[in-house]
Amino acid sequence: MSTHVVIYTMQSCPHCVDFKKMLQTEGIDFVDRDIEKNEEEYQIFVEVTQNDYVPAVLIIEEGVEKHKSFLYAPDRDYNELTEAVAIIKKHLA
């Protein structure tokens, strides 16, 4: 099974900048989707999350027979960036 981490961010968001630094410090590989730069990506993000809070985390677990996705959003699934990092680490373990 392989696990992929996608984070949804905005360049103007200071929490997003801090979050990316935390993930890099922890050695966590991730794909950064800047929804501020891509209107289509932004619309999909809002539709899926039902809000526009960032940074949000999408975890994709790909297995031989099944594929699972988990979406975590601020103020819904975590309040602190350290909690988001812990959630990601749990999926990567």
Model-flagged regions — what are they?
Residues 20-23, 47, 72:
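Short, glycine/charged-enriched secondary-structure capping and boundary segments
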Residues 1-28:
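Local sequence-structure signature of Cys/Sec-based thiol-disulfide redox active-site neighborhoods
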Residues 35-53, 81-92:
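Thioredoxin-like thiol-disulfide oxidoreductase module
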Residues 59-93:
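Non-catalytic, surface beta->alpha helical segment in thiol-disulfide oxidoreductase systems
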Residues 12, 35-38, 74:
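Short beta->alpha junction loops/turns
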